[in-house]
Amino acid sequence: GVKENTKGNFAIYKLKQPNKVYRSRLWQQADRHSLTKEDYYTTFPNDLYADENNKYKWEKETKVLDKAFDTGLKTDYDLSAEFKSFKPGVYVIEANCKDKFGEDIKAFSYITVFNKNNNEIPEQTADWFYYPKTMAEPGEKVNYILASGYSNVNYLFEFEHQGKLVSSKTELASMKSNE
């Protein structure tokens, strides 16, 4: 494609996520429900009724940023200072502009914001992982975060080399960085 300069704006919204952890679906989602949502949760309090874990369907909770842009003047925007004030959670970035024919163009991007020095998990999920580096050389240390929306969860790590178990350990799930 050919670059076209345009003006528009983008807004960032914090999304309202479920207030509890749901168990992963054990069967396909029903296309029709025989129970009301309330009756279902009374019987199956930890199971998904509909699309509660689908971030693309979560409501917007709060607009946290609204900025104009002009790609004729600037194409990169550093928002690191603004992100420092964001609370951990899932956000959607919505960009709006018009093309050279006056047609509306909308783009969406979903991001997760978290703080490695804070114990607040950004999503209500059974297991949340962050690996800043996906590959390492022998002897090199790798940092990672393994967290859970449940309390007192342990993870089992087993390291193999050429099909043989080299080591095994358990760690408590936490938003603190591990090696």
Q: What positions do the PLM features span?
A:
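C-terminal segments of large proteins
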Residues: G1-E179
